[in-house]
């Protein structure tokens, strides 16, 4: 029995070491429609992030980058990244992210959100 418990602890530990940072939640939400322009995009990941080698970009429908290029890590939550936005007009916006977790694994993805006015 003791051997099985030690094996489980070892396997769980290895799984944690091999963890990747995946999108856990975003604000604005993935595929969401919101009434007015958000002031920023916030993405929380499943693992802590290395902000110096990570990115979040926001593009309008024409492909122009519209974020303020001021990506920063949340002071109290090192799995949460923010990027500021100017006042956005009505339309569909694409968020493209690429992050490196503290264990050096790279993940990336994208999603859209829609602003009504």
What are these regions (language model features)?
Residues 41, 47-69:
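Short, surface-exposed alpha-helix to beta-strand junction/turn motifs within ectodomains of secreted
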Residues 30, 36-37, 89-90:
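Surface-exposed loops/turns
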Residues 4-13:
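Bacterial N-terminal signal peptides
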Residues 84, 89-98:
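A glycine-anchored, Pro-Gly-centered beta-turn/N-cap motif
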Residues 25, 70, 82, 108-112:
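Well-ordered beta-strand positions in beta-sheet-rich domains
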Residues 76-82:
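Aromatic sugar-binding surface patches on proteins
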Residues 34-36, 40-47, 104-117:
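Extended, polar beta-sheet/loop recognition surfaces of beta-rich domains
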Residues 13-25:
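Proline/serine/threonine-rich low-complexity linkers at boundaries of modular beta-sandwich domains
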């Amino acid at each position: 029995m003791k051997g099985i418990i030690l094996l489980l602890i070892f396997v769980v530990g290895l799984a944690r070491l091999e963890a990747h940072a995946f999108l856990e939640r975003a604000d604005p939400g993935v595929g969401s429609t919101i009434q007015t322009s958000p002031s920023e995009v916030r993405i929380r990941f499943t693992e802590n992030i290395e902000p110096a080698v990570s990115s979040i970009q926001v593009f309008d429908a024409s492909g122009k980058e519209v974020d303020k290029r001021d990506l920063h890590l949340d002071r109290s939550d090192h799995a949460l990244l923010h990027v500021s936005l100017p006042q956005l007009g009505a339309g569909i916006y694409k968020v493209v992210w690429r992050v490196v977790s503290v264990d050096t694994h790279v993940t990336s993805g994208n999603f859209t959100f829609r602003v009504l006015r």
